[in-house]
């Protein structure tokens, strides 16, 4: 384990369970992002801090992997650690252990820091915080998307409604996974939970605007792409477990 890390304990909320009682992959991303924000706040980097420094943190891409998908009501421990900014990207790894101390999930998130005044990516933050960063974080997940350019199937159109948007006024990063699962044929998601996901965020979809979503089988899973005003908004690759069809009683 790297020397600088932050630990947060959670209970999987009922509202974050799917039809089988398992935690939705989008919920994992929300819990992970909350732990990252709490980590920063514990070192004095709150909303006011970022406003005063004229910067914003955005997620560029992220991946998650489940060894076992937890059920609603389970008590979990999230351990998150961040690597020093390299070429404008901050790697943050979050691991999840269950009540028995077994690691059941990992998330690899790549954050970017943007100057609000000049609207460009900063290669290094204009401050230092002792005890927050690690020189390196060894663990990582594959971030490949296994893109498909042909034979894409149109799933439909999604509106960035109130329930999908966050304080920034556009679709929340985690909810793109819900959209991706909604876009796929129901038989696919019924067969088993998501065990791996890689997602890239290209352009935001503002509140009230629409996005077309397309999908295609790819490698061992499914490739999805969302387009807003003719430009790519997000791309995603999902893999599902085959056979974990039992429900939590």
Task: Name every feature range the model reports, one short phrase each.
Residues 74-75, 150-154, 209-210:
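Short coil-to-beta-strand transition motifs
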Residues 3-8, 63-146, 205-207, 216-249:
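HotDog/MaoC-like acyl-thioester-processing domains
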Residues 47-48, 55, 73-76, 92-94, ...:
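Short, positively charged
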Residues 158-238, 246:
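Acidic/His-leaning functional-site neighborhoods
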Residues 1-59, 106, 114-195:
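Hot-dog-fold acyl-thioester-processing enzymes
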